[in-house]
Structures are given as C-alpha cells and as structure tokens.
Curated annotation (Swiss-Prot):
GO terms for cellular component: tRNA methyltransferase complex. InterPro entries: SAM-dependent_MTases_sf (IPR029063), tRNA_(Gua-N-7)_MeTrfase_Trmb (IPR003358), tRNA_methyltr_TrmB_bact (IPR055361). Transmembrane segments: none annotated. It comes from Staphylococcus aureus (strain Newman). GO terms for molecular function: tRNA (guanine(46)-N7)-methyltransferase activity. This is tRNA (guanine-N(7)-)-methyltransferase. Catalyzes the formation of N(7)-methylguanine at position 46 (m7G46) in tRNA.
Length: 214
C-alpha cells in the first residue's frame, strides 16, 4: 500500500502524548501507561485502526496497543480512539523491530498480525513479520499462555509463515484456509480484509503458540 505523505501528521500526533508514543517515552512502562492493570494485546501494523478499535470497544477488560510506523496512517487510528472515547487503547508509532524496547519479557498476552506486507521477493524475506528474528521478539515479550493470531489474503505469505513458525518451534491451535467460509461470526474485519473479501479473495488465518515462551 502506498501511503500519501501528510506533513502535518507528526505534529498532530505529538499533541496527544497521553495516547501516542512517538519517542519511546513509555518504553518499558506499558502497564503504567494505562488507567487499569489488565492483560495487554498488541496489533502490529494496525493500518487505519478498524480492527484494533473494534476489539478495544468490545473488550474493556483488556488493554490494547496499536503499533504502526507510518505517521500518515497513525493519525486515523488516533482519530478513532478519540471519537470512540477508548481508554484501553494506546498507540506506538514505531517499527516492530523495537518491540523489546517497549515491552518487558512476558508482559504481553496476545499479538495480532493482520494483512502484513508479504515482501514477496526472497531477498526481502527478513522484513516479513513472521521471519525468525521477529518470532524471537514475540517469544520474548509473550507470557507463558500468550499466542499469536495471523491473518492474510496472501497464500504465499501464509505458507511461508506456517513453515517459519514450525521451524522456530511453534505449534498451531487453529488454522483456517478459507476464513469467511468457516467463520463462526466472531471475526472482526480489517479495512483491507473487507476490500479483499469483496473481490472474492480467500482469507487465511491461524493461531499459534510457542512450545516454550522463554
């Protein structure tokens, strides 16, 4: 997805430090950032925020973190948080490679990866969010019962991710090869998921855990 540059977005985000972390000011202090101490769930690459804001509204007993590096998109998540009055959702504007700078070991209960960039060229494999270096970060910050939820329309990325996770020592608790045909009604659509689904694209989904989180 090509993101149109918004020169004003950085200043707009900086005007809301209570909701947006742009400079690592809350690194290592995620729990203290929220009004209540509750389980923490993260979505990495939140896009415009439809998925994460819907989750936060439905589950006030869980604290959510939206992690998105594109400032020109993050402002849309911020607008939704403000409009919906969500107190259990915060935003980190940074790259996922910095995860362990923000979260303590075992601090997170769930990670969502929705429609991540597939980086189809082999030479770019290390940029995929299911590459082993990212899996190592997830393992570090997830608690013993924590899990990873992954969703994509890209069959190649899904196959790669299944293999990458298996080789890393993860196991799968759920695999859907055609999510919308098998959906039990609990699925929350992202903006892109609706677009892909309307075009007839198949949606793939999995839930996975580490055999040993530490």
């Amino acid at each position: 997805m090509r993101v149109r540059y918004k020169p004003w977005a950085k200043d707009y985000l900086k005007d809301h430090p209570e909701l947006v972390d742009m400079d690592g000011q809350h690194a290592g202090k995620m729990t203290e950032w929220f009004d209540k101490t509750q389980p923490i769930h993260i979505e990495i690459g939140s896009g415009m925020g439809q998925f994460i804001t819907t989750l936060a509204a439905q589950n006030p007993h869980i604290n959510y973190i939206s992690m998105e590096r594109e400032k020109s998109i993050v402002y849309k998540v911020l607008d939704k948080v403000k409009e919906m009055g969500l107190t259990n959702l915060k935003i980190i504007c940074n790259d996922a490679i910095e995860l362990n700078e923000y979260f303590k070991d075992g601090e997170v209960s769930r990670i969502y990866l929705n429609f991540s960039d597939p980086w189809p060229k082999n030479r770019h494999a290390k940029r995929r969010l299911t590459y082993h270096t990212f899996l190592a970060l997830y393992q570090q910050i997830l608690n013993d019962e924590g899990d990873l939820h992954f969703k994509t329309d890209n069959r190649g990325l899904f196959a790669y991710s299944l293999e990458s996770m298996s080789q890393f020592g993860m196991y799968f608790t759920k695999i859907n090869l055609n999510l919308h045909q098998e959906d039990d009604g609990s699925n929350i659509l992202t903006e892109y998921e609706k677009k892909f689904s309307d075009k007839g694209s198949r949606i793939y989904r999995m839930e996975a855990k580490f055999h040993s989180q530490k």
